[in-house]
């Protein structure tokens, strides 16, 4: 596609405020964290399809999260790299389904939504036969929670001992001033609230609340395709964590005031709790700082926090009781741990879903199904049924076991 065809196109705005792009841009920066390279995809497409893809992706970028746009772009990159496609029709969809296989068949949902919008926008190169083929194919839902099911020592929930060792270690090293306040607060919030990393790094000072009922965090929703900081859930926290977060906010305010040599008390509430100090340092004028304060620009990057979290166990010598190796630590394991602990304590599926901020109870079922106490109880109940039956089949005390089996069945009704 010649650049002159798209250079005159309008500027498109990403879902996240502050970020925009043109169709001709090689790189579309969608928020502080994520960007996409759509021209790597269109370089693999026939000429008459290129503009259609770019326009549809631009529409998506204005409506959906950057992570979702990355998923779309990455999937199309692999699809058009694996086979030659002149138009997206039933044959192309069939080939994609074969290419994905049963394990990744769920990704067809991404394609289905995207090309349906493509077709509705009346852009060429998507045939109605493609949509009909997608209706015929049985799309298998993504199997989530495998690490929870297996109680994976490296990816699944932490044991009580492992969890306590982590919390004790960061507390010890924080008081010894060997770990920074922001990382200490971040790990505690992951452990206590079970919230997703993006929810925590989206927090602002005004989200920290103290009243006669206690201490709270007003945590923004992020996964359910919400706009940046538009919907929230209130979470209660302990007073000691409130104090630590207040101290962190004070440090952030002092850093900004020192940088610009001006007081910002009136804007304190807008300060990110987890602030990217490098971005503050790079900003030249207080006017530019205030202009970007309502966006995600000065919030810490998730990738940076994940890397710091990953290195904590080796830095502070925290090992797994199951493998004797350094614990593989990430935010997801804290969520798994909270869900599993609640299930062990007998919490209902609704309570677990609310605690983990799940959109529905479906994602929380994995904790109830795989609660070890539930498994033990089921096994105990079934053994009364299977033990006499297996003895009969093996010829052991047939009459006695037959009576046991008949009694069990009759008692069951």
How would you name each of these model-derived features?
Residues 173-179, 257-275, 315-328:
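Short helix/loop segment immediately N-terminal to the Walker
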Residues 1-156, 162, 168-171, 176-178, ...:
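Charge-rich, intrinsically disordered N-terminal extensions
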């Amino acid at each position: 596609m010649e650049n002159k065809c798209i250079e005159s196109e309008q500027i498109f705005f990403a879902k996240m405020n502050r970020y925009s792009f043109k169709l001709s841009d090689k790189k579309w920066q969608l928020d502080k964290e994520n960007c996409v390279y759509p021209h790597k995809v269109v370089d693999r497409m026939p000429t008459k399809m290129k503009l259609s893809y770019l326009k549809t992706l631009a529409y998506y970028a204005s409506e959906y999260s950057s992570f979702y746009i990355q998923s779309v772009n990455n999937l199309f990159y692999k699809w058009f790299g694996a086979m030659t496609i002149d138009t997206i029709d039933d044959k192309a969809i069939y080939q994609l389904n074969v290419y994905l296989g049963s394990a990744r068949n769920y990704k067809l949902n991404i394609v289905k939504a995207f090309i349906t919008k493509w077709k509705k926008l009346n852009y060429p190169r998507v045939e109605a036969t493609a949509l009909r083929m997608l209706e015929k194919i049985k799309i298998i839902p993504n199997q989530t929670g495998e690490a929870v099911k297996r109680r994976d020592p490296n990816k699944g929930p932490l044991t009580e001992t492992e969890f306590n060792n982590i919390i004790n270690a960061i507390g010890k090293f924080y008081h010894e001033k060997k770990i920074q306040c922001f990382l200490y607060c971040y790990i505690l919030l992951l452990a206590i609230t079970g919230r997703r990393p993006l929810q925590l790094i989206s927090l602002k000072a005004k989200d920290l609340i103290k009243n006669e009922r206690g201490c709270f965090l007003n945590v923004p929703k992020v996964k359910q395709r919400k706009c940046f900081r538009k919907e929230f859930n209130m979470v209660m926290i302990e007073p000691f964590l409130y104090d630590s977060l207040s101290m962190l906010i004070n440090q952030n305010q002092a850093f900004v005031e020192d940088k610009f040599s001006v007081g910002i008390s009136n804007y304190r509430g807008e300060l990110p709790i987890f602030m990217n100090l490098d971005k503050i340092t790079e900003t030249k004028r207080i006017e530019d700082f205030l202009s970007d304060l309502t966006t995600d620009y000065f919030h810490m990057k998730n990738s940076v926090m994940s890397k710091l979290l990953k290195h904590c166990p080796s830095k502070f010598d925290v090992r797994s009781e199951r493998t004797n190796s350094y614990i593989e630590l990430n935010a997801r394991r804290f969520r798994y741990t909270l869900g599993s602990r609640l299930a062990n304590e007998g919490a209902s599926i609704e309570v677990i879903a609310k605690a983990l901020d799940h959109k529905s109870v479906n994602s929380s079922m994995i904790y109830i199904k795989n609660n070890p106490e539930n498994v033990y109880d089921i096994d105990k109940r079934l053994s009364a049924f299977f033990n006499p039956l297996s003895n009969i089949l093996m010829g052991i005390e047939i009459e006695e076991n037959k009576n046991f089996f008949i009694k069990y069945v009759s008692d069951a009704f």
